[in-house]
Amino acid sequence: MDAAEYGILLAQKYDANLIALYASPKIISSEYYEDNDIRTNKSVLGGGIAELPRHEIEEKSFSKIKEKCKQNNVRVITEVVLRNKSVAADIIDYAENNNVNLIVIGTKGRTGFKRLLLGSVASAVVTYAHCPVMVVK
């Protein structure tokens, strides 16, 4: 199960609203683009989304989550946060400003020594968030 699925499960169990948040820096360095050209609106290597209109980001990021929420009778609010802060800071700020009770965040599976460490975004959110944080591998 991924973080979104856990979030949906918890929202269903506790009859809570689910906020699906997409946070990304507003400007992403062109070195991460498939063709190294920021004007082409290509997606970021690794499946991310960059420099797309807000409605396209929402559609690409939230379509599966919205469908799963509908199937499970879970109220979902979708938000896109594109600022010049770090992704972790944007998540933390959003949670504080919107009285979020629990943050469910995913982290990439690691092996060996790296398994002992969280990703930088998840680690910062766990460290600085005002509310409990559930990290899903």
Regions of interest found by a model, annotated:
Residues 94-137:
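Gly/Ser-rich helix-loop-strand patches that form or flank binding pockets
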Residues 30-33, 89-90, 115-116:
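Short, well-ordered secondary-structure micro-motifs
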Residues 23, 79-81, 136:
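Conserved beta-strand termini and adjacent loop/short-helix elements that scaffold enzyme active sites
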Residues 1-47, 68-77:
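Small/aliphatic-rich secondary-structure junction motif
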